[in-house]
């Protein structure tokens, strides 16, 4: 029997009775609840044998929930109630028994909408759990639904962008800012550890997600450790502060030291070759303009390197238009990126001989690369060598497949 029940008319509702697909195991019935809720409440009981019942709504007590808002302009309770009248309650809510009946743990929006729809009963899973387990379940469910909402919103924005063909038109339609648009679209292309924040219901905070992305780009191992820690301390400690601290930990030193034949620090190898410092004016510190995380929850400021690495992924790996990337980029980020790349353009203009040697030097010291920010730096440098007019769109367009 399908574990999802459709309740379309109150006249069709039977007396409360358990509906069982398999015998549920009581021992450790709540183990792994926070993880399982990542796929919805149904997933919580998939391995145990789902057991749910039709419970009268007037037997359910609703106590103070973590969630305070149950609707917005695009997701009203009236809309959900109308859907329930047609399709029924497709996902059971989660309850635990108490002396007066049942206490609602997760699914208050469905509970409220069912009352609006005129239902008398609702499908529910009933589980024994401690106060701590109940709070964890509420938090995991709320993070899960917020992430789903944000990702669906990001997909809708992308569809609007494709349809309208103009960033300004999308901003006007949604009455939002460019930084908001950039952050929302970034949710559609998350690396592994940042994606875990969403899939495993660790966080729905876009700032935390973006910070983990920055850490993961530099040190994937540290990013995994960070996500594991955030998952373990979810709801108990400040996630933004934790993420910002790890970002500070992994960012490169401004003045690395060479020792005993180790690789010469970035941007200094040319001195050993007796070469002219063609990159003297170029900006190498990838976090020189980044927010240090000490004043959370101040808005996150991405460094030029982070912005360029994100842009490279979107252009080269996902095939997005360079023009669209630049149009969606917040003005402050674009200004920093332009200044950063222009320094390499100026370095290229200063080279009057042996361009090949300068390029090799750039690859040796890590300034240039075949991908990421190093690829953009190389393109800007070569544009300077050729004395071509500097245009961000031309630089970005050069990294396409």
Swiss-Prot record:
SUPFAM superfamilies assigned: KorB DNA-binding domain-like, ParB/Sulfiredoxin
Gene Ontology biological-process entries: chromosome segregation
The keyword Ribonucleoprotein is assigned to this record: no
Protein origin, superkingdom: Bacteria
GO cellular component, one term: chromosome
Key word DNA-binding present: yes
Chain spans, region Disordered: 232-272
Keyword entries, A-Z: Chromosome partition, DNA-binding, Plasmid
Pfam families, alphabetized: ParBc
GO molecular function per UniProt: DNA binding
Entry similarity comment: Belongs to the ParB family.
Record's protein name: Probable plasmid-partitioning protein ParB
Species annotation: Xylella fastidiosa (strain 9a5c)
């Amino acid at each position: 029997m399908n574990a999802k029940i459709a309740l379309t008319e109150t006249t069709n509702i039977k007396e409360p009775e358990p509906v069982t697909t398999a015998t549920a195991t009581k021992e450790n019935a709540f183990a792994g609840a926070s993880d399982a809720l990542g796929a919805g409440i149904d997933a919580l009981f998939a391995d145990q044998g789902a057991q749910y019942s039709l419970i009268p709504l007037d037997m359910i007590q609703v106590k103070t929930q973590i969630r305070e808002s149950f609707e917005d302009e695009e997701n009203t309770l009236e809309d959900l109630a109308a859907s329930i009248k047609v399709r029924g309650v497709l996902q059971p809510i989660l309850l635990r028994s108490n002396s007066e009946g049942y206490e609602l743990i997760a699914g208050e929006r469905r509970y409220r909408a069912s009352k609006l729809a005129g239902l008398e009963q609702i499908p529910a899973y009933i589980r024994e759990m401690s106060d701590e387990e109940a709070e964890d379940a509420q938090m995991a469910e709320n993070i899960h639904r917020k992430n789903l909402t944000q990702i669906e919103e990001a997909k809708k924005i992308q569809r609007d962008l494709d349809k309208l063909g103009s960033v300004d038109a999308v901003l006007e339609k949604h009455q939002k800012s460019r930084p908001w648009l950039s952050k929302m679209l970034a949710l559609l292309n998350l690396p592994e550890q940042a994606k875990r924040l969403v899939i495993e219901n660790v966080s729905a905070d876009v700032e935390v997600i973006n910070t983990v992305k920055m850490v993961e780009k530099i040190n994937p191992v540290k990013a995994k450790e960070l996500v594991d820690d955030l998952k373990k301390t979810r709801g108990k400690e400040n996630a933004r502060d934790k993420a910002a601290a790890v970002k500070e930990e992994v960012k490169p030193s401004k003045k690395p030291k060479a020792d005993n034949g180790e690789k010469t620090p970035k941007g200094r190898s040319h001195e050993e070759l007796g070469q002219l410092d063609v990159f003297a004016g170029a900006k190498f510190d990838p976090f020189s303009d980044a927010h240090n995380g000490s004043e959370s929850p101040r808005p996150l400021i991405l460094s030029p390197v982070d912005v360029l690495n994100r842009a490279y992924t979107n252009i080269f790996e996902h095939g997005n238009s360079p023009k669209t990337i630049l149009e969606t980029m917040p003005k402050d980020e674009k200004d920093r990126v332009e200044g950063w790349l222009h320094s390499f353009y100026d370095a290229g203009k200063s080279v009057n001989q042996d361009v090949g040697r300068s390029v090799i030097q750039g690859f040796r010291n890590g300034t240039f690369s075949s991908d990421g920010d190093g690829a953009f730096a190389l393109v800007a440098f070569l544009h300077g060598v050729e004395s071509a007019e500097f245009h961000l769109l031309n630089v970005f367009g050069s990294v396409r497949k």
